[in-house]
């Protein structure tokens, strides 16, 4: 199994990207990894791993590039060439920590949208207080969604949670402004009715305040609401850890307490670090495409590659297609 990796995407490229790829190649003997990007910058970081190859490119899609224009004009960019490896069947999946919009465009225009999918969805796995985590989709691939799209998101999330995350009977929740059945706008009300008709384990509406409590294994939303909720969770977590740091360094007694609590705080931070779950999968394409966080370090890239491998091993794309045809 070959996995293509955009070595030039992200804040710490190419060093941390290559390190993560080396970790994954050493850990999973059944994969080969193709690093795509500027070979002169990549080569110094590659240290003797036989199952790592490099494809040289001389263009990079930058964070501030307009996504669709960049994908169409920068044909020799690391991201576009990465997607072409998948399209041509030389790679089974691909990963990038680069420009999110450009990756979605490359996924749609190069890898291609699956025939049975109306709208792709961007789906990270976020941590919960019980350590189980939950799949959240859509968080920004499409700001608008029809009820039928939300139903498809639920099915895709179900397949992923069951086959990759090992949840036997995933609980599906619909993000809404209240838990009562009739809450929400016309889109969510209609989506609620559609989800009730499926064979999925639909538990009803869920509120944003309960997401980190582990109320559901899969939460579906339109891309606008999903992205707002995701950014709120990220911002709140950063603010809380910043506040804790200020409090625990504010005096001698606080610093002594911090020394005692340091192992516990490190464990808490690790538990809430969603890079441990991999990247955000772009569901609805012809092959697994993973968006790693822009600030990904080697460990995050390792987990994104692990995630891509598991999606291929468990044939998540084929299973989604079969489930949609059966629905």
From Swiss-Prot:
Report the catalytic activity: a fatty acyl-[ACP] + phosphate = an acyl phosphate + holo-[ACP]
Q: Which GO terms describe its biological process?
A: fatty acid biosynthetic process; phospholipid biosynthetic process
Q: What is its EC number?
A: 2.3.1.274
Alphabetized UniProt keyword annotations? Cytoplasm, Lipid biosynthesis, Lipid metabolism, Phospholipid biosynthesis, Phospholipid metabolism, Transferase
Give a GO cellular-component term: cytoplasm
InterPro entries to which the protein is assigned, alphabetical: FA_synthesis, Phospholipid_synth_PlsX-like
Which domain of life, per UniProt? Bacteria
**Parts of the chain that traverse the membrane:** none
PANTHER family the record matches: FATTY ACID/PHOSPHOLIPID SYNTHESIS PROTEIN PLSX, PHOSPHATE ACYLTRANSFERASE
What is this protein for, i.e. what is its function? Catalyzes the reversible formation of acyl-phosphate (acyl-PO(4)) from acyl-[acyl-carrier-protein] (acyl-ACP). This enzyme utilizes acyl-ACP as fatty acyl donor, but not acyl-CoA.
Oligomeric and partner information: Homodimer. Probably interacts with PlsY.
- What protein name applies here? Phosphate acyltransferase
Starting at the broadest rank, the lineage of the source organism is:
Bacteria, Bacillati, Bacillota, Bacilli, Bacillales
Gene that encodes it: plsX
């Amino acid at each position: 199994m070959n996995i293509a990796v955009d070595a030039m995407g992200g804040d710490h490229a190419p060093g941390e990207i290559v390190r993560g790829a080396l970790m994954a190649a050493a850990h999973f003997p059944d994969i080969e990894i193709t690093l795509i990007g500027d070979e002169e910058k990549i080569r110094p970081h590659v240290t003797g791993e036989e199952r790592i190859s490099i494809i040289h490119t001389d263009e990079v899609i930058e964070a501030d590039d307009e996504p669709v224009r960049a994908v169409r004009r920068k044909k020799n960019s690391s991201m576009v060439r990465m997607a072409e490896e998948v399209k041509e069947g030389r790679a089974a999946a691909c990963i990038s920590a680069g420009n999110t919009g450009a990756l979605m465009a490359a996924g749609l225009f190069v890898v291609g949208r699956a025939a049975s999918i109306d709208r792709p969805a961007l789906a990270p796995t976020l941590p919960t207080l019980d350590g189980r985590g939950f799949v959240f989709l859509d968080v920004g691939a499409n700001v608008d969604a029809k009820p039928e799209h939300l139903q498809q998101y639920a099915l895709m999330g179900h397949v992923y949670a069951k086959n990759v995350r090992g949840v036997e009977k995933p609980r599906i929740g619909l993000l809404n402004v209240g838990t009562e059945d009739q809450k929400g706008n016309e889109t969510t009300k209609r989506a609620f009715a559609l989800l009730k008709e499926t064979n999925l384990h639909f538990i009803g509406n869920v509120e944003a305040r309960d997401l980190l409590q582990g109320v559901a294994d899969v939460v579906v939303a339109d891309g606008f609401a999903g992205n707002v909720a995701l950014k709120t969770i990220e911002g709140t977590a950063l603010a809380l850890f910043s506040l804790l740091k200020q409090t625990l360094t504010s005096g001698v007694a606080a610093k002594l307490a911090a020394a005692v609590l340091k192992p516990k705080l490190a464990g808490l931070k690790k538990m809430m670090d969603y890079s441990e779950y991999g990247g955000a999968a772009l569901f609805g394409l012809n092959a697994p495409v993973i968006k790693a966080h822009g600030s990904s370090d080697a460990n995050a890239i390792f987990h994104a590659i692990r995630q891509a491998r598991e999606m291929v091993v468990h044939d998540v794309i084929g299973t989604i297609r079969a489930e949609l045809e059966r629905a």
